[in-house]
Regions:
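Short beta->alpha connector loops at strand-helix junctions that form conserved
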Residues: 53-54, 89, 115-116, 138, ...
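Short, structured interface segments
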Residues: 67-77
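N-terminal positively charged helical leader segments and presequences
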Residues: 1-69
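Structured adenosyl-cofactor binding patch, chiefly the S-adenosyl-L-methionine
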Residues: 22, 70, 105-107, 121-135, ...
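Amphipathic alpha-helical repeat scaffolds
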Residues: 6, 92-100, 210-215
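RNA substrate-binding interface of SAM-dependent RNA methyltransferases
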Residues: 22, 26, 76-164
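Short, glycine/polar-rich helix-capping loops at beta-to-alpha or helix-loop-helix junctions
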Residues: 36-39, 119-126, 186-191
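Active-site/ligand-binding-proximal alpha/beta "capping" segment
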Residues: 160-208
Length: 228
């Protein structure tokens, strides 16, 4: 079970994953008006229960202006073998994962492989940070990178590493590809330098590295800019 915290996220949930919605909670402080009327109509049309209760908001949300919560069942996805992927190896931060999902949807790369151990994509913090992009993202968990490779390895592979020799602006993916990123704290293990073509995003010496969502977003932009 998971939750969409806030009316904007809940509208996205109702739009893209209606069949997985159990119920919608509405706080007593939610103002009457067109927005609430629209929400109630969507729920009625899809036969979704609306529950007026305040207590659950105290448990699930620390934001004072959260007046709508959608409760939904976890859903399964499949990765398209003919599409390009984002691969996150051992991501541990919920906010980062959600932010990457949002960028991936924006750049048309909303297919994500997640290598365990990893944060739960259905953590409400991921859902919130994704701004609803999770409901339009294909994502699959794998117990190891080798498991991912066995099923989806027939593609161009680009692990992003600080000791890589090739700079991002010199990379020109020609076919389906995977952009591979490591854990926020440790990056990718050294053995990934032997997989595909390792890549570095050049930046000034004033910083040690870019944070994960920024690096992933820059990489996705460069890889897909010809499409827009």
């Amino acid at each position: 079970m998971s939750y969409s915290l806030g009316i904007t996220l809940t509208f996205e949930l109702l739009k893209f994953k209606t069949e997985y919605v159990n119920r919608v909670y509405v706080h007593s402080a939610m103002k009457q008006g067109d927005t609430l009327d629209k929400l109630l109509k969507l729920c009625k049309d899809s036969d979704i229960e609306v529950v007026y209760v305040d207590k659950i908001f105290n448990v699930l949300s620390q934001k004072e202006n959260c007046y709508v919560i959608g409760e939904f069942r976890k859903f399964e996805s499949k990765l398209d073998k003919e599409s390009s992927h984002i691969v996150l190896v051992n991501p541990s931060n919920a906010g980062n994962m959600g932010t990457i999902m949002r960028s991936a949807l924006g750049f048309g790369m909303n297919r994500m492989a997640i290598i365990r151990p990893a944060v739960d994509a259905f953590d409400p913090k991921v859902v919130r940070a994704s701004m609803g992009a999770i409901f339009s993202t294909e994502f699959v968990y794998f117990d190891s990178f080798d498991e991912y490779m066995k099923e989806y390895g027939d593609r161009e592979l680009y692990p992003f590493m600080l000791d890589a020799k090739m700079k991002l602006h010199d990379v020109s993916p020609r076919d389906k590809f995977s952009l591979i990123f490591g854990n926020e704290a440790t990056g990718l293990p050294h053995e990934f330098s032997n997989i595909g073509q390792s890549v570095i995003i050049p930046h000034s010496a004033r910083i040690d590295s870019l944070n994960l969502p920024i690096a992933a977003s820059i990489a996705m932009y460069e890889a897909t800019k010809a499409d827009f």
